[in-house]
Amino acid sequence: MFSKIKGTHDLMLDKMVCWQKVENHIRTLFAKYHLQEIRTPIIEYRGVFDRAAQHSEMVSKETYTFTDKKGRFITLRPEGTAGVIRSYVENKLDKTSQLHKFFYYGPFFRYERPQKGRYRQFHQVGVEILGQSSPFLDVEVIFLAYKTLKSLGICDITVKINSLGCKTTYNNYLQVFKNYLQTHYQQLCPLCQERFEKNILRIWDCKNCNNEPFLKQAPRIFDHLVEDAKVRFLQVLEGLKQMNVNFELCHDLVRGLDYYTNSVFEIVYNNEQGHQAVLGGGGCYDNLVTLFRGSPSPGIGFALGMERLMSILATRSFCNKNILPSLDAFILVSEPQFFYQGLELATTLRHQGFSADLNYKFLSFSKSLKQALKKQPLYLLILGPKEFANNQITIKNTYTQQQTTILQKDVVSYLQNNKELNYIHEN
């Protein structure tokens, strides 16, 4: 027997129903923001991710990369932004003056240590908006990420936010920070000594060094923002207040990818035990399109991790409230010679927008009934010898236990007038 690969998981049955419900909810919400879905390949040339985040540990240590039959390096996508930018430039959308608002959803891959809420194949839903840079756009994008979680009933969340400033601020601060840490180099853990040379801002993320006094006393990037960047960031903070977003200024927030500029943020969930889990994050990337040899085109985006999101929702009313079953009707055919009449009826119901199923084995009535009820239909439609002879069908509501016999030609109108089914189709 084969088992699934470590760090992956199967989605099926009730879990799949809950996932689909959440996916549909998010799609409906994003449509109201006039976001268009974009689907990029799961595989890209390795250079796509090298170009976007050459010095990030995700690219250097966590990607699944292999060579194809022509010796080219292919990578399973570890994140969504790089593929969207590659597509944006390749399709010459950077040459237009339009604001492009995209969302994506799908699987991603990183080779990291599996643990609760973290997998090697995982799912993200993300938003990328390209073509403009504005503090007001920052506010709406952050608010959308916040609103998405709140609309799912996850209210105990906080937006942690910082600014990395413009390119000038970023470069100046890197030198200031490096000069400061030079005198504390021996106090850095081995990983942070490596980061010191390649991606120094990631030292702020280190769990080993983060509580050390020398890092708490380190220069903050906020204090080195040029005036325009500081004014811009203060406008973002004011906008979040206006939108009643629960946020916290976090000076050590830098995010894991090195293409971010200006506003960066994470959304953390505060559970009942007082622990925090990052549900998603994002920020601005004013220079990323030019790294892909596109025309200057600023952008902002975010991604939410579905596995962590679903682990919270699994215990919430969004997935657990008592909803009516998704199967409208099960047609119980008692004899093989009645099967095609039952199949025609099922086809008619499906054509009219109802979900319908029927049996393919013909057991005793009691056994067939037991099998049918396992499908949890709202209505059981029984086609036996008497019904077959008179072009009738016996309909039983599996919740109220009410039963009636009507002509087969009246089944559709009967179901269309049913309040329970109207509830299902409206929700």
From Swiss-Prot:
Taken from the UniProt entry, a GO cellular component term is:
cytoplasm
Question: What chemistry does it catalyse, as a reaction equation?
Answer: tRNA(His) + L-histidine + ATP = L-histidyl-tRNA(His) + AMP + diphosphate + H(+)
Specify the domain of life of the species encoding this protein: Bacteria
- What are the GO MF terms of this UniProt record? ATP binding; histidine-tRNA ligase activity
Is ATP-binding set as a keyword in this record? yes
* Keywords from the UniProt entry: Aminoacyl-tRNA synthetase, ATP-binding, Cytoplasm, Ligase, Nucleotide-binding, Protein biosynthesis
Q: What class of enzyme is it?
A: ligase
The cross-references to InterPro entries, in alphabetical order and at most eight, read:
aa-tRNA-synth_II (IPR006195), aa-tRNA-synth_II/BPL/LPL (IPR045864), Anticodon-bd (IPR004154), Anticodon-bd_dom_sf (IPR036621), His-tRNA-ligase (IPR015807), HisRS-like_core (IPR041715), HisRS/HisZ (IPR004516)
GO BP term, pick one:
histidyl-tRNA aminoacylation
In terms of SUPFAM superfamilies, this protein maps to:
Class II aaRS ABD-related, Class II aaRS and biotin synthetases
Q: Which Pfam families match?
A: HGTP_anticodon (PF03129), tRNA-synt_His (PF13393)
**What Enzyme Commission number(s) apply to this enzyme?**
6.1.1.21
Q: Where in the cell is it found?
A: Cytoplasm
Principal location class: cytoplasm
Which proteins does it associate with, and in what oligomeric form?
A: Homodimer.
Q: Which family does it belong to?
A: Belongs to the class-II aminoacyl-tRNA synthetase family.
* Protein known as: Histidine--tRNA ligase
Record the organism: Aster yellows witches'-broom phytoplasma (strain AYWB)
